[in-house]
Amino acid sequence: MNGIVLELQKEAMDKNADIESLLRKSYFIARKLKLPEFEEWIQCEQEGYGKKETPEYRMIQGQLKALNPVRGWIPVVMESAIAEKAFTKTKLPNSVSELYDLYQNAESSMLVMNLPAERNKYVAKCCGFNTQFRLEFGKNQIYSILSRVKNNILDWALTLEESGIVGRDYSFSEEEKKIAQEKTEITNYITNFWGTTTDVQVQQLSLIHI
């Protein structure tokens, strides 16, 4: 029987692999190897990030639109690149299961995110007119987030193998556990997920079809 790390690699390369199953198997491996930071990342992907820092790969960009009483939803033109970044980019802290459901149940290629009340009030003040605002974006951006999670798992599993960690059935030798603790490319692996820190808004996504 192949080691569990090799199993994980094979499953992560399968385009039809269940992402939650991949996360559970990754959590099992991380727990066995005593890699708490990677465990925490997996739990955040499973349960959502909440108030914790959300990785850069969960960034989406859309088009900000305002509700015009006569013309309906119209694009909002920004006066500066800074304002455009602030109002058209956001990070999605939702769990992967929520994101997957949103992607699967989308009735069109576009999704809509209504702005929270306080955020809407702030945008209205900046734009100079009081109305309802929303962000429209392609559902392919949700797919990109899910794909990135799978790629992270695959790359992590390859890093383990390259370091001599493959497991025997569903257990690891003391030598493999020692390697996992001593190699910084393993213990610090999740630093690859964050990239350059930004001050972009983080917003929970609930689906509206257009």
Where do the language-model regions lie?
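Charged, amphipathic alpha-helical oligomerization/scaffolding segments
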Residues: 7, 14, 18-21, 25-28, ...
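Function-dense linear segments that define catalytic or interfacial modules
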Residues: 202-205
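Membrane-interacting alpha-helical segments
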Residues: 1-10
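The right-handed parallel beta-helix/beta-solenoid scaffold, focusing on the short coil/turn
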Residues: 198-200
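Conserved small/polar residues in nucleotide/adenosyl-binding loops
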Residues: 208-210
